[in-house]
UniProtKB/Swiss-Prot annotation:
Zinc finger (C4-type): 33-55
Function: Component of the acetyl coenzyme A carboxylase (ACC) complex. Biotin carboxylase (BC) catalyzes the carboxylation of biotin on its carrier protein (BCCP) and then the CO(2) group is transferred by the transcarboxylase to acetyl-CoA to form malonyl-CoA.
Catalytic reaction annotation: N(6)-carboxybiotinyl-L-lysyl-[protein] + acetyl-CoA = N(6)-biotinyl-L-lysyl-[protein] + malonyl-CoA
InterPro entries listed in its UniProt record: AcCoA_carboxyl_beta, Acetyl_CoA_COase_Trfase_b_su, ClpP/crotonase-like_dom_sf, COA_CT_N, Znf-ACC
Organism, scientific name: Prochlorococcus marinus (strain MIT 9215)
Top class in the EC scheme: transferase
Protein name stated in the entry: Acetyl-coenzyme A carboxylase carboxyl transferase subunit beta
Length: 293
């Protein structure tokens, strides 16, 4: 091997071999966009809110990153952090549900797939729930449903607006009917919140599907979505096989739902806090909170 070939091999090992396909995987210096295949310096991607500067693809981010984008610095106060799922049905497919819970808790550092709490957005109060797709696909089980219900009830008592960041594959099948009941429970809590004329906003991120879409994700006074997010109930193939029709290429995207009136506004990630600030000011959030003191 010539000296030039040796240097070329070394260079390939140092750079090409460390390109990651996902911002959540590995610790390489470079990340390859799953949408346009553009290779970006990881630190540049993170500083751009994990959005590809070439094609504007919004990569998945975790719950902590979401909170940092929305909440004022050091303003987030978490509730119900000790709640953890159990296995009431003794469910087992290829692996037991209990083992899946442990694996997800170990890999994510979370107890379940949502973080809830109060925060401020440019000094205006907000009740915040952030689903995390890393934990069993963001599926909604009894703990996720209970935590979201509790934060809604707390917000109702204090006249706080609510933002729920949705990222979910739907109801958690390992909990059967217990997971399905969370749809009704959360919807009931939102109805009481609405009866006080308080603001509720879901933010639909990629993906938002199944029982989450069929319940609280579509009950907002103002429904926000991230660009190109997959939003739907059943999967595309299931619908095509049932209807025996070819669906449009952009079917179940945020843009398609905006065009057909199911989404009110598409918000780029870097503009989210500014958009929320405008909405909260228009709704006179501080005045509502003061009236409840």
């Amino acid at each position: 091997m010539s000296l030039i070939d040796w240097f070329a091999a070394r260079r390939k090992d140092q750079f090409v071999g460390k390109v990651s396909q996902d911002t959540d995987e590995g610790d390489g210096l470079w990340v390859k966009c799953s949408e346009c295949s553009q290779v970006a310096y990881r630190k540049d991607l993170i500083s751009n809110f994990n959005v590809c500067s070439n094609c504007n693809h919004h990569n998945r981010i975790n719950s902590d990153e979401r909170i940092n984008i929305v909440a004022d610095k050091d303003s987030f106060k978490e509730f119900d952090s000790s709640l953890s799922p159990t296995d009431p049905l003794g469910f087992k497919d290829r692996r037991s549900y209990a083992d899946r819970i442990k694996d997800s808790q170990t890999s994510t550092g979370l107890r379940d797939g949502v973080i809830t709490g109060f925060c401020s957005v440019n000094s205006m109060p907000l009740a915040l729930a952030v689903m995390d797709f890393r934990f069993m696909g963001g599926s909604m089980g009894s703990v996720v449903g209970e935590k979201i219900t509790r934060i809604i009830e707390r917000a109702t008592k204090k006249n706080y607006p609510i933002l729920i960041v949705c990222a979910s594959g739907g109801a958690r099948m390992q909990e059967g009917m217990l997971s399905l009941m969370q749809m009704a429970k959360i919807s009931g809590a939102l109805k009481k919140h609405k009866e006080k004329n308080l603001l509720y906003m879901p933010l639909l991120t990629h993906p938002t599907t199944g029982g989450v879409t069929a319940s609280f994700a579509m009950l907002g006074d103002l429904i926000l979505a991230e660009p190109k997010a997959l939003i739907g109930f059943a999967g595309r193939r299931v619908i095509e096989q049932t209807l025996r029709e070819k669906l449009p290429d952009n079917f179940q995207t945020a843009e398609y739902l905006l065009e057909h009136g199911f989404v009110d506004v598409i918000v780029k990630r870097r503009e989210l806090k500014t958009t929320l600030t405008k909405i909260l000011k228009i709704h006179g959030v501080n005045e509502l909170v003061e009236a409840n003191i």
